[in-house]
Amino acid sequence: MMRRIAAAAALILLLPALAAAQDLVSLCERARHPAVGAWSEFKWVGGRNDGATIRMSIVGKERREGADYLWMEIVMRDFPMGSGRQQAEAPRRMISKMLVPGFGAGAGSPRAAIIKLGDLPAMEMPVGQSRMGAQGAPNLEACQNAKVVGWESVTVPAGTFRAIHIVGANGRGDSWVAPNLPFALVKEVGNDEGQSRQMVLIAHGMGARSLITERPQPFDPRLFVEMMSGRRPAPKP
């Protein structure tokens, strides 16, 4: 009898975590396809990217070869690029625009990509190199293999949210994800080269439009290297 009581008590204690795990699966599935116009902005606190911001948005959709794709745009500001003089001269803003099947794992295999550094002209990118624009951006990998802690209240600059607390599959890094947010993520805590760092939601909303308004020029490897190093390309004759 005591064993049955203990088993029942253990099950009762597990029910909230089991329910949160089911909620997480549903939440992550919805977050893979944000609505056109949805946006979220995050800020890094601590670590080598301290003070940097990332704004993620869905600025359009397109149908190719019978499949629907989203234009996802990532605006990165004040991220360190290079080192020394190169870092000082590098553009402080980078815009990456990618045509992807959805947010999350699919975003790593874009069908098309455009990049714009500072106020320099936008440039098409080979799709095999387009992941560079998404480095440091939040993703949904944790949704697939995370350990669920449970529902918690978490406060960030964007407000207070009821969110699911999850821990990465490798035991490193905690994240809080919430329904009804464009990209689910509310807060992420981890370690960056021995330094504690956080990425927190500072704002979100609808009505996003692409910041790349000009027609991008074809990819030019030499020009791209100059742009990344902070050197302004010489005008074409």
Q: Across the structure, where does each feature detected by a protein language model lie?
A:
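Bacterial N-terminal signal peptides that target proteins for export
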Residues: 1-9
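Bacterial N-terminal signal peptides
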Residues: 8-16
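Sec/Tat signal peptide C-region and signal peptidase I cleavage site
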Residues: 17-21
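Acidic, serine/threonine-rich low-complexity disordered tracts
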Residues: 22-98, 113-237
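Phosphate/oxyanion-binding loops and surfaces in catalytic or ligand/nucleic-acid-binding neighborhoods
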Residues: 101
